[in-house]
Amino acid sequence: MSEVPAKAKVVVIGAGIVGNCLVGHLARLGWTDMVLLDKGPLPNPGGSTGHASNFIFPTDHNKEMAFLTVDSQNQYIAAGLNNTCGGIEVARTPERMEEFKRRMTSAKAWGIDARLVTPAEIKEMVPFINEEILLGGYYTPSVSVVDSLATGTMMRDEAVGKGVLSVFANTEVLDLLTEPAEGGPRIKAVVTDRGTIEAEHVAIACGVWSPRIAAMAGANIPLTPAVHQMADVGPIDILQQSGKELAYPIIRDMDTFCYERQSAGSMEVGSYAHRPIFMHPDEIPSNEEAALSPTELPLTYEDFDPQMEQAIELMDMLGDAEIKYA
C-alpha cells in the first residue's frame, strides 16, 4: 500500500459525487497538486452516491436553486450522463392542486417547461396508475436521472488525466491537525493510515460522515444522518416489457410523501412520510460490516408498510410483486 504525498495544495476528503465533482471543477479552473481521499473502495466507496435514486426535478420557488439545477442538468447532458424521462407530481387533494398552480408561476418565471395535467393525461403517460384517486398533476418533461457513480468517475478521471490529482481509495482519515490563524484555527495537515499530508486547503465532502471528520478539527457541521425508506419492488411485467431503464415518467405522490421511479424491470418506491430515524455518524457500519453498503440499512417494515399501502393504492401492480431489496 503506497504512502500519500507529504504535501498538497488541496486535500479533498470523500470520493462521492460531491468530492469527485469538486476536484473535477477545480481542475477545470486550473488548480493543481490535489489529493482525493476515501476510506472506501472505488468507484463506489459506500456512501449515498452509490444507491440514491438520483432523479432531478428542476422547478424550485428559489431562483438560484432552480438555475443551479438546470445548469447541472445541462452539464450532465453534455457529458452524456443524463437520462431524461419526465416527471409528474400528482395531487390527491385540492390544496395540492393549488400548490401546483403556484409552482407553475415559478416555472414560467424561470423559463422551465412545465404544465398542469389532468388525471386522464397522467393515465396516458403512465398506464398503470390509478387516475381515479387523483385530481391532476404537474408535469415537467425535463425531469431526469443522472448516473452519479459514472459522473463522479468522469470528473475524477478528468482531473487525474490532467496530472493535477492523486487519488487514494481505502485510505482512512485518522485526524486533522490545526494551527492558530486569523479568525480561528485552520487545518494544516491531514493524518491518514498511509501517512500525513500537509495541506493549504482541506475540503470535507464525506456526506453523512462529515460531522465526524470536522470534529477532528474542532469544527461543527450541523448535519444529522437520517434513514430514508426505499425499496426495489419487482419484477413487474409491464416494466420488463418496456426494455428500458426508464420508459415512464417518475411519479412524486406529494400528498403521501412518496415517489415511484422505474428501475428497469422493477419499481423503486421511496417514502419520506415515516418517523424521523436518526443515526450518529459513529453508528454507521463499515464496508466490512454492512450487508450491502454502509449507507444501505435494513428496511424497517413498521415504518414503511403504511406508505407501501398508499403506493399500492396508486399503482396496484406493486401489490403483486415482491420487495427485491430495501
Question: What do these predicted ranges mean?
Answer:
Residues E3-V18, V35:
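Beta1/beta-strand and adjacent pyrophosphate-binding region of the FAD-binding site
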Residues V18, L42, W209:
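Conserved Rossmann-like nucleotide-cofactor binding loop
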Residues A27-S48:
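Glycine-rich FAD pyrophosphate-binding loop
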Residues A52-M125, D255-E260, A264-E268, F278, ...:
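Dinucleotide-binding Rossmann-like beta1-alpha1 core, especially the glycine-rich loop
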Residues G86, N220, I236-A326:
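Active-site lid/adjacent beta-loop-alpha segment flanking the redox-cofactor pocket in flavoenzymes
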Residues Y139-H201:
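Helical element adjacent to the flavin cofactor pocket in flavoenzyme catalytic cores
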Residues T192-P249:
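Central helical "cap/lid" subdomain
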